[in-house]
Amino acid sequence: MEALEEPELCFPHINTSCRRMRRPYMETTLMYSVLSCIIVLTVILNLLVIISISHFRQLHTTTNLLLLSLAVSDFLMGLLEMPLHLHYQGCWLLGDRMCALNIFLSFLLVSVSVGCMVLIAIDRYIAICDPMFYTTRVTLTRVKLCVCLCWKFSAVHSIWMLRDLLKQPDMFQSCYGECTFVVTFAEGLVDLIATFLGPVLIIAILYSRVFVVAVSQARAMRSHVAVVTVDRSQTVKAKKSEIKAARTLGIVIIVFLLCSCPYYSFAVAAESNLIGGPTSGIEIWLMYINSSLNPIIYVFFYLWFRKTIKYIVSLRILQPGSHDASVL
């Protein structure tokens, strides 16, 4: 009887094979159902964001370009990383090289998301605190360059972190069929500073300044400050919309930080951190689930996103000239 209760081997014909994780049937069914729904939601909602910003010309703005980069990262997370992490329950069946590629993509996409958050904070800082020079300093060309550099830096950082794993994909395996990567304390500290503490410090400094300016602007509007010219009244309206955008994107950043804190707290507490193991699920899934929360925030706070969803779902997006439709 005891032999029957032991977890089965991932590869029965190999003595050094890992063993499958065994969970109660109801727990497994509930976990797979909930996480599968989250994965589908992540893919669909982020795809809607990508289609919306790419298709409609009115949405081709510098801020939305940053949201597009973030949506692409979140979409790939939902399409590639989350299903593989859900499927991996102690048995990795896709080979060592695919394991290394899987961990690389996880590092890359998380780093890109962090970089996009920093760029969004910089964008809002200039828009709110230095609006006179926003259109001249923040151009589409410069934002595209920053987005490209963000992805390239994230790739370089991920390759450096995983340099040993990429050379020898099976070096961290304790049994055949395992997909893990061990981060040493020194490497974890570098990763912590580069992808969390440093960006959080930058975001906190920039948004604290944005908050102060936004509060002063809100007080000025409530006190009915006299507006002399039409140009100034338009500037006030523009500032009001910029402040509203800053509030929405501030919520996106706060949610991201809340979802990331548990993982980095574990990284700080441990002398070495096991990445990709089946038992390291809770904090990693919190980071993954953040990818589905961003478009949900857009639904509640961005009227243009709700309008574009209607265009896409009703297939009006296929009509000639739909890219020039008014969605703002």
Name what the model sees in each region.
Residues I39, S69-G78, C146-S158, T195-V200, ...:
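Alpha-helical transmembrane segments of multi-pass membrane proteins
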Residues I202-I203, V255-V268, I282-L328:
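Seventh transmembrane helix
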Residues V43-S54, A71, F75-M82, L108-M132, ...:
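Cytoplasm-facing ends of alpha-helical transmembrane segments in multi-pass membrane proteins
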Residues C10-R22, C91-I103, L108, D130, ...:
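Loop architecture of class A 7-transmembrane GPCRs
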